[in-house]
UniProtKB/Swiss-Prot annotation:
Residues 58-74, 145-146, 205-629, 685-687, 731-732, 788-796 are extracellular. Keywords: Membrane, Phosphoprotein, Transmembrane, Transmembrane helix. GO terms for cellular component: endoplasmic reticulum; membrane. PANTHER family: 60S RIBOSOMAL PROTEIN L19, AFR661WP. Pfam families: ArAE_2_N, FUSC_2. Residues 567-602, 967-990, 1096-1125 are annotated as: Disordered. Residues 1096-1122 have a biased composition (Polar residues). The modification Phosphoserine is found at residues 1167, 1198-1199. Its main location: membrane. Residues 1-36, 96-123, 168-183, 651-663, 706-709, 754-766, 818-1219 are cytoplasmic. The chain crosses the membrane at residues 37-57, 75-95, 124-144, 147-167, 184-204, 630-650, 664-684, 688-705, 710-730, 733-753, 767-787, 797-817. This is Uncharacterized membrane protein YGL140C.
Length: 1219
């Protein structure tokens, strides 16, 4: 191996473990230069004389307010730091003033040692006042850090000023203290801003344009790839219109998380721009509507990708050669409803609609490309960043160079908008005309139609969102052209966005991201880029958030209180002295006057009691909401007072000062976290940082040979600061890196500046500070109100389950049969959007907690296996929330025909399905939070959803009986077992779940059913049904994973402990003669060892969509052992039981000429078994309401091969026992 190849290998290995891009390298360079210059200023005596009594604060503040971020982030950090300095300095001077008053008039004449000897009591009282002020400051510091991590940039400088000022001698004046803790701080902040603007400036507005273009590139690519994947079923077809083959499913699924992070980063950078002065033609706020549209576009693209995933399952592409990333990405449960749909029908429809979809896709892709070009020109982004689409064979996309200043003049935006509108209308018309050519069987509600509707609705909404983007781009282009006509000098303006409206001011004051940690605040960048490193701390979700978002009882109670408070007693008689206006006062509320003394006193007492009770309720609510703030406030106060109590005791104060007690408190405050983290791991990292920094400072000082060579000393410190800034800016270990960098300069300056300590003593005292201060912080955080990551993980997963239940209830409208004007109001959608955002943040926290749990000590065995289960749980919850977002936005945009027109008929079925889902999710929520097993019985949402689909299909047949019968004559004859067999009502009507339809007025309905089912609202319901099937399937999988984590309650004894009828059915088949004569011996059934062994026993042959006996298992959520039948058939007394062929029953083989088992016996045997996943295709087909005999290949209806698979399994078990 040559030297060059070895170096290349070493370089790749280095970049793998320590990734670094160009932006990070520039930021490290800026920060290192800034801190080095600050250290050089401390070495110059003339500059040090102007810095006051604490010149070592200059390098420290240069690290805290570092320039290694964008301009907006630096200004943001500077504003927060200055705010903390001002209030901290004022608070410290006030506390010292009161302490000096206790010393009397001699406070400025005597030293602290003399005060200790001459005025001990006064000196002790003054230190007691300082201690009280210190405790109040520490509690406020912890409270503010717990309220919002944004405020860490304010309260940390406040702590530094107050803590260090209280350590200074009490005989120093207020002017000396103000100079010591203002000049170096303000100089360090000014230097950071200077180097941020001079050396590699990063303007947020320019970065905003680049980020928006990058996000639109990914969105554009995802749209093209997903549409190509869906309609290009046969990539080898010569009539294929695309020049590229479809990408793999794995790559398509990975794009969802990528586009989500890109769009979120756009919003973050937009909020960061409010701190900047921008000199440009167009204000950055012009991108706000585009970014909002991109967020909605992300939801529709996720819907497109999900439909591609369903199509992949339906077309059974697993029979073909799969790419490795396809196999890795397709981690789906086996019992997918879509796998039982008819692929031929879907392919037939796609083949018809292929040209229509392609035409709109091509126009939409071209408009997206033009929009990116215009935005790149408007915000001075290099045109080379814009990616064009080259997957169209007849595509003619223009390309431009970077110096194309006349770019907008070559593009007619309005013409492109008109083309897109026309293409959208043509797509709707052609789609309607093409679909009208099919028979009603294809148009009826089915899994194929659900899949197609989901794709078409998301596709159209994507085109509508592109149209909205084009309108916004047109306004930006017009604004840019107007400003350009004024010339370069007058055209550009200075934009400052912080005080433009209340929203930007609120963001500036409080921030807009609840998931920001203190590390992100110190780092100054909120894009979550940690270069592959895991977070060491996570922000904890406020306890009151769950009550605000998920507690329906609280909101209802508020309404009750409000209503009760507004009730007034009616007047029964007219008060004295008010003889006039009788008609007015007779109907008015009771008015109490001064003459009614008794009533006034009674009312005043009631009002007093009500006010007192209201005050108690408010206090109780405040304490409940502020519980985590109290907890961390007490933690900070206890830890810091344990670490620094000697500074407030007269006898130990001087000793504590000599041992650098301020360092102990400084290390202790940085080791305390209001977040959940690996406490021992974080303490270890920060201890290593302090020791390494102090050792590097010692090395630098020794290399300078006792300050004889300060140049070499400075150069060596640079090599120690570079890795520190790398860990500060490029990894989540921010506070460990801060302590390491500060320790380098603090240890050196303690020996360089006039003091009694040499360099070795300073190194030892710094190590003592991390051992004592960090140890105290560790003890307090472990034993005083500890937070455990594994408990927080369960809480977050439980919270997400509650969010899903609440979103499902908000998504459902009209569950009581009432008439609703809109199926999704704006208010409900805003609530769903808010809950969805909180749930996604909770999932991000759960992912971090999952990694942190490995660092915690555990006594219950290894955590590795449980971590894999939690990984799957988080993934499934994310998929559920993603699909609820999609269907909610689709319903808001298009409505729902079933809710708005059929709700009076189908609402009991909708209510049962929604209630089942909500019940399941609430049961999971309580199981996770309480760590209790699941109950024995849980409702089946899958069956409820199938019944809803069947009822909608039946309602359509009742609404249009004549048209459907005419269309059905051309089609095949329905199967005998089909649900849609012409009956007006099914068996569930006898249970009172469905209301009879009023036949009056329906006979006059002559509308074409094709016209109805092609309405946008009905397509929206079809699309939501496809997503609802997926949601139910994921919920069942989540239920199974929950059983692994918390277990499930099972009946150990009694009738429900095992399926007794299974033994009866087995004996009826194997020993019919003995069974008839009453000589049967009950067999001992074997119970499953684990509730998840279903996949091991269902292994009789390969899976096939055309097979009559499907072997895929469907695990019902009702119990861990038994499986609920999908289609139980009641026993009919009119059937003739004499048609049994005992020979065939005993042989288990289908005869050629003999009659088989009667249909009633087979159905009855199926209904009494406890396995639903092992059904014949006839039963599955009957449930779905499809009646295609060619598709099912059910040639012999009475064949013995149609016996339930569960019955065959029992027979196989019996043979094994005999063997």
């Amino acid at each position: 191996m040559s030297l060059k190849s070895k170096l290349t290998k070493i370089q790749k290995l280095w970049l793998y473990y320590f990734p670094c891009d160009r932006i990070l390298a520039k930021r490290i360079c800026k920060s290192t230069v800034n801190t080095t210059v600050a250290f050089i200023f401390c070495l110059i005596p003339k500059i040090t004389a102007h810095l006051g009594a604490a010149p070592a604060m200059l390098p420290m503040i240069s690290v805290i307010v570092h320039p290694g971020r964008r301009v907006g982030g630096t200004i943001h950090g500077a504003i927060y730091c200055i705010t903390g300095l001002i209030f901290g300095l004022a608070y410290a001077i006030f506390g010292r003033f009161l302490a000096q008053r206790c010393l009397g008039s001699s406070w400025h004449e005597l030293t602290e040692a003399q005060q200790h000897v001459l005025h001990y009591k006064r000196y002790e009282a003054g230190l007691a006042i300082l201690a009280v002020f210190e405790v109040i400051m520490l509690f406020f510091h912890g409270w503010m850090r717990s309220v919002s991590h944004y405020y860490f940039g304010i309260v940390f400088p406040l702590f530094v000023v107050v803590h260090f000022a209280f350590m200074d001698p009490l005989n120093e004046t207020a002017g000396t203290i103000a100079k010591a803790y203002s000049t170096p701080f303000y100089l360090g902040i000014a230097m950071s801003i200077f180097w941020n603007l001079v050396l590699f400036p990063e303007w947020g507005t320019t970065y905003l344009g680049n980020t928006t273009i990058d996000a639109m590139n990914e969105l554009h690519k995802s749209i093209d790839y997903s549409i190509n994947f869906f309609i290009a079923v046969d990539p080898h077809n010569s009539s294929q219109l695309y020049s590229r083959d479809p990408v793999s499913l794995g790559k398509l699924l990975k794009m969802k998380s990528l586009i989500s992070s890109k769009v979120n980063n756009c919003r973050v950078v937009l909020h960061e721009c409010i701190y900047e002065f921008t000199y440009a033609y167009v204000s950055p706020t012009k991108l706000k509507p585009i970014i909002s549209t991109l967020e909605n576009l992300t939801v529709f693209i996720n819907g497109l990708v999900n439909t591609c995933q369903l199509e992949f399952i339906l077309l059974a592409r697993h029979d073909n050669k799969l790419r490795p990333d396809d196999v890795a990405a397709l981690t789906l449960p086996k019992n997918k409803e879509i796998s039982f749909a008819n692929a031929e029908k879907l392919l037939k429809v796609i083949d018809k609609l292929h040209p229509v979809i392609y035409s709109l896709h091509r126009t939409m892709s071209e408009c997206m490309y033009i929009a990116k070009l215009v935005l790149a020109h408007a915000f001075d982004v290099k045109v080379s960043r814009v990616h064009s689409c080259s997957m169209f064979k007849d595509g003619n996309f223009p390309t431009f160079s970077n110096n194309a200043n006349n770019l907008p003049n070559d593009v007619d935006i309005q013409n492109k908008i008109n083309d897109l509108k026309q293409a959208l209308e043509e797509c709707k018309a052609k789609f309607k005309s093409e679909m009208l050519s099919f028979d009603i069987d294809i148009m009826s509600p089915s899994d194929e139609m659900f899949l197609l509707s989901s794709f078409l609705l998301n596709f159209r909404q994507t085109a509508d969102s592109t149209l909205v983007i084009m309108e916004s781009v047109k306004d930006i282009l017009v604004k840019r052209q107007i400003q350009e006509k004024k010339g370069w000098l007058r055209g550009k303006r200075l934009w400052f966005l912080v005080l433009t409206n209340y929203e930007t001011f609120s963001i500036w004051l409080k921030g807009d991201r609840n998931s920001v940690t203190e590390n992100d605040t110190l780092k100054g960048t909120f894009n979550g880029n940690t270069n592959g490193f895991a977070h060491d701390t996570v922000i904890r979700r406020p306890d009151y958030e769950e009550n605000e978002l998920l507690s329906q009882k609280v909101s209802s109670n508020k309404n009750i209180v409000k209503d009760d408070a507004s009730l007034d007693l009616p007047m029964t008689s007219e008060p004295k002295g008010n003889s006039s206006s009788t008609s007015d006062t007779s109907s008015s509320p009771l008015t109490l006057t001064k003459t009614t003394t008794f009533g006034t006193n009674r009312t005043s007492r009631r009002q007093g009691r009500f006010s007192f009770m209201s005050m108690l309720i408010s206090i109780d609510k405040f304490c409940e909401v502020s519980h985590p703030h109290f907890r961390f406030g007490f933690q900070v106060a206890i830890a810091l007072m344990l670490a620094s109590f000697p500074m407030f005791i007269p006898k130990t104060r001087q000793w504590y000062i000599d041992y650098r007690g301020t360092w102990i408190g400084f290390v202790c405050i940085l080791c305390l976290e209001p977040s959940v983290g690996g406490t021992f791991w974080v303490f270890f990292l920060r201890a290593v940082g302090v020791i390494f920094g102090a050792a590097w400072g010692y090395l630098s000082y020794v290399a300078a040979v006792n300050q004889t060579n300060p140049y070499l000393e400075t150069v060596i410190t640079v090599f120690g600061a570079i890795p520190g800034f790398y860990y500060l800016l490029g990894t989540p270990y921010v506070k460990a890196a801060i302590i390491e960098i500060i320790s380098i300069y603090i240890v050196m300056l303690a020996a360089i500046l006039p003091s009694q300590d040499d360099i070795l003593t300073s190194f030892a005292k710094r190590c003592l500070a991390v051992g004592y201060g960090g140890g105290v912080a560790l003890i307090v955080q472990v034993f005083f109100f500890p937070l455990k990551a594994r408990e927080q993980l369960n809480e977050e997963i439980s919270f997400v389950c509650g969010c899903i239940s609440e979103m499902e209830l908000l998504y459902a409208t009209g569950l009581e049969g009432e008439q609703v004007a809109s199926s999704m109001s704006e208010e409900k959608y805003k609530k769903i959007e808010k809950i969805s955002k909180s749930a996604k943040e909770a999932l991000a926290r759960a992912t971090a907690y999952k990694g942190l749990t490995r660092q915690e000590p555990r006594l219950k065995g290894e955590y590795t296996e449980l971590e894999n289960v939690f990984t799957q749980v988080i993934f499934i919850q994310k998929q559920i929330i993603e699909r609820i977002d999609t269907i909610s936005l689709l319903r808001k945009q298009n409505g729902s025909a079933v809710i708005e027109e059929f709700n009076s008929v189908v609402y009991p079925y909708r209510r049962q399905m929604v209630g089942s889902i909500s019940c399941l999710m609430r049961a999971l929520q309580e199981a996770f939070i309480n760590k209790t097993p699941l109950p024995q019985f849980l409702p089946s949402a899958r069956i409820a959803h199938r019944r809803l689909i069947n009822k909608v299909r039946q309602t359509l047949r009742i609404r249009y009986p004549g048209q459907i019968s005419n269309l059905s004559d051309k089609a095949r004859k329905p199967n005998e077992g089909d649900y849609a067999d012409g009956k007006d009502e099914d068996d569930d009507d006898n249970e009172g779940l469905v209301m009879k339809m009023n036949r009056r007025g329906q006979a006059n309905t002559t509308a074409n059913p094709h016209e109805y089912v092609l309405k946008e609202k009905f397509l929206s319901w079809n699309a939501s049904s496809a997503a609802s099937e997926e949601i139910i399937e994921y919920i069942e999988e989540l239920l199974n994973l929950t059983k692994i984590l918390v277990g499930v309650n099972e009946f150990k004894y009694g009738f429900l402990s095992r399926p007794l009828y299974e033994d009866w059915a087995a004996e009826a088949v194997t020993g019919f003669d003995n069974f008839i004569n009453g000589k049967s011996n009950p067999m001992n059934t074997r119970r499953n060892r684990t509730p998840f062994d279903g996949t091991s026993i269902i292994s009789e042959g390969n899976e096939s969509l055309q097979s009559t006996n499907s072997n895929e298992s469907q695990i019902s959520p009702d119990s861990t052992r038994s499986y609920e039948p999908e289609c139980p058939v009641a026993y009919e007394k009119n059937d003739n039981p004499a048609a049994l062929n005992l020979l065939r029953i005993a042989s288990h083989k289908a005869g050629q000429n003999a009659d088989g088992l009667p249909k009633t016996f087979r159905n009855r045997a199926f209904s009494i078994t406890s396995t639903s996943g092992q059904l014949s295709s006839l039963s599955r087909h009957s449930t779905l309401g499809n009646a295609d005999p060619n598709y099912l290949n059910d040639d012999d209806e009475s064949s013995d091969d149609d016996l339930p698979l569960a019955l065959k399994m029992v027979l196989s078990h019996m043979k094994e026992k005999k063997d």
